[in-house]
Amino acid sequence: MKYKIEKNTVQETLILPLYSRKLCTELYPNLYRDETAVRLIDEIDYDFSEAEKNSRSLMQRFGALEVAMRQNDLAFEVQAYLKTHPCAAVVNLGCGLDNTGRACDNGRCKIYNLDFPDVIALRQQLLPAGEREQNIPRDLKDPAWFDKIDASGGAVFFASGVFYYFLTEQVRALVQGMADAFPGGVLVFDAANRTAVKMIAKTWLRTAKIKDVGAYFAVSDAPKEIGEWDSRLRVSSRGYMLGYNDLKDPSVSGFFRFLARVGDNGMKMQIVKIGFGDRQ
């Protein structure tokens, strides 16, 4: 029996990124594989006709490539941390229906998926927690979730497409709180400069009737701007389209590689990595 998703619901907002990850898998099979997304889309009763029609457009295909690179980059950083901290907590912040934690599983780490209660309720049905895995129904901005994480073996946190919807002060408070709670841990996430965030925000800000786009989190020079928040933070960043992969694959056109350079350099689309405290 298929799981029915209605239009204009919270569940629908989770289905579209899932569809995008399925599209990535089909368009760029040498660069990205998300078998969970392919399987889940097949198990869901939802009218994908509009998404399928849009998937033929040039910008939708480039958007799918962006999603693929972002997920690959974050997974790379999680796996790099697990090489030196094999029993670490792997924490997906704002997880939706993303299964990156399980994809990075080394057989010893502890996996946590954190999101709002209504999101986790859907996740429990479609992606029930497996061995060494917990789904945590919490608001990311509420530090009460810190106590749910067993960081005795270290902790690596990642957030995909999440902080664009946070005020700068909210990101700063979260990062400083995590530095207190998880010394030796690492947080990785995607970010972009003010110009890019304004473009990302166009639609949802209009519907939310929010005027001050400038208050939302954006960053150009992450080591300088975020490093100033707290002396305990070790901050680095890499372009998220070309910082981890040269995209010299037959599935990626020269025009898309040009757009990738514009994204990394002009829009400062980047993966930011923050190390907390002294313990490594």
Regions found by a protein language model. Name each.
Residues 1-91, 95-138, 151-152:
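Rossmann-like AdoMet
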Residues 143-152:
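Short amphipathic alpha-helix with an adjacent loop that forms part of the alpha/beta core around
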Residues 157-158:
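A conserved beta-strand element that flanks and buttresses the S-adenosyl-L-methionine
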Residues 165-178:
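A short, conserved alpha-helix within the catalytic core of class I
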Residues 178-194:
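Conserved beta-strand signature within the Rossmann-like core of class I S-adenosyl-L-methionine
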Residues 198-213:
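Short, glycine-/aromatic-enriched active-site segment of Class I SAM-dependent methyltransferases
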Residues 213-240:
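Short alpha-helix
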Residues 232-258:
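Conserved catalytic loop of SAM-dependent methyltransferase domains
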